[in-house]
Amino acid sequence: MKFQPLGERVLVERLEEENKTSSGIIIPDNAKEKPLMGVVKAVSHKISEGCKCVKEGDVIAFGKYKGTEIVLDGTEYMVLELEDILGIVNAGSCCHANSHDHKDHKHAEACCHDHKKH
């Protein structure tokens, strides 16, 4: 099933939590906390055509009580507002991480860094 987030939202699949502690103790499913990181599976048109700071495939960190959980085809996802994303794991700058040129920005003023500095 295809899902297209609206507004400034992203669809995220949570990363799996470890089943063992560092000392080897197995953690039962009901005792695990849900991870606060996930992989972006879809972004809204407003983000993909605007700031482009988050794209499909990015690993992001988000707040503990943020987003809305949904189930699509038996898989759990989170729908998060752009402002609820704390950061991108191993990210470069917006333009260079997304392989586009400054001249290609239609909405440079909405981007997450100052184009005049580059």
Curated annotation (Swiss-Prot):
Compartments it resides in: Cytoplasm
GO biological process, one term: chaperone cofactor-dependent protein refolding
Stored InterPro entries: Chaperonin_GroES, Chaperonin_GroES_sf, Chaprnonin_Cpn10_CS, GroES-like_sf
UniProt cross-references to PROSITE patterns, sorted A to Z: CHAPERONINS_CPN10
GO cellular component: cytoplasm
SMART domains assigned: Cpn10
A Pfam family reported for this protein in Swiss-Prot or TrEMBL: Cpn10
Keyword tags: Chaperone, Cytoplasm
SUPFAM superfamilies, per database record: GroES-like
Domain of life according to the entry: Bacteria
Claim: Chaperone is one of the keywords in the record: yes
CDD domains: cpn10
Example of a GO MF term: ATP binding
Main location: cytoplasm
PANTHER family for the chain: 10 KDA HEAT SHOCK PROTEIN (PTHR10772), CO-CHAPERONIN GROES (PTHR10772:SF58)
Protein family according to the UniProt entry: Belongs to the GroES chaperonin family.
Function: Together with the chaperonin GroEL, plays an essential role in assisting protein folding. The GroEL-GroES system forms a nano-cage that allows encapsulation of the non-native substrate proteins and provides a physical environment optimized to promote and accelerate protein folding. GroES binds to the apical surface of the GroEL ring, thereby capping the opening of the GroEL channel.
Subunit structure: Heptamer of 7 subunits arranged in a ring. Interacts with the chaperonin GroEL.
Protein name as catalogued: Co-chaperonin GroES
Origin species: Helicobacter acinonychis (strain Sheeba)
Taxonomic classification: Bacteria, Pseudomonadati, Campylobacterota, Epsilonproteobacteria, Campylobacterales
